[in-house]
């Protein structure tokens, strides 16, 4: 049976099928350039990350599951997505993913990685993780066809929104994130960070 340890020693390139067949471990891995790369090591998520993830998930889930939502769908945490990066299979695992039922109908959802391009992914910075590295990941998401990427920085108490056709914009304090692409959704950074208990 394949294991992460054996693969790291052999430097064997993984196919998406081999990667998805690996046994689950305590560490979350992503498939990057044929290698199983730890998502957070050595910067394990801490309390702020753990607090922010369910709060942001709940905001997105409440919005996209409301009867009046123009783009009904579902929000997910830690759901692998089948993408392409630099012409190679790429399987990232965003902290949060929102996908509409138009892109992935309910009846097409199975206990498998996300096979459609979601509208939004959210990544929360962990201690020791460089903002630059996450910005590059945001660019990779956009290049793969995901139209919106949010990078949440607990230290700066900011949310930076990345767009495919405009420069990124950072929101702090009472600056509300409102986007015609996600109609009806309103996120105020200071409210999110206050709810998470981040001073």
Model regions: which residues?
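Gly/Pro/Ser/Thr-rich low-complexity, intrinsically disordered segments predominantly at protein N-termini
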Residues: 1-199
């Amino acid at each position: 049976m394949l294991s992460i340890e054996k693969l790291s020693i052999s430097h064997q390139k993984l196919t998406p099928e081999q990667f998805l067949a690996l046994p689950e471990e305590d560490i979350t891995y992503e498939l990057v350039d044929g290698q199983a790369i730890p998502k957070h090591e050595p910067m394990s998520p801490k309390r702020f990350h753990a607090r922010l993830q369910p709060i942001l998930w709940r905001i997105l889930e409440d919005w996209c599951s409301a009867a009046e939502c123009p783009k009904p769908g579902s929000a997910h945490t830690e759901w692998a997505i089948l993408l392409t990066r630099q012409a190679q299979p790429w399987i990232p695992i965003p902290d949060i993913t929102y996908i509409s039922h138009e892109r992935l109908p309910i009846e097409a959802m199975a206990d498998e990685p996300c096979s459609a391009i979601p509208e939004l992914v959210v990544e929360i910075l962990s201690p020791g993780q460089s903002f630059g590295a996450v910005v590059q990941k945001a660019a990779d998401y956009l290049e793969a066809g995901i139209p919106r990427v949010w990078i949440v920085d607990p230290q700066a108490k900011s949310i930076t929104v990345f767009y495919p056709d405009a420069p990124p914009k950072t929101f702090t304090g009472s600056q509300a994130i409102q986007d015609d692409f996600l109609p009806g959704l309103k996120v105020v950074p200071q409210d999110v960070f206050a709810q998470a208990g981040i001073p």
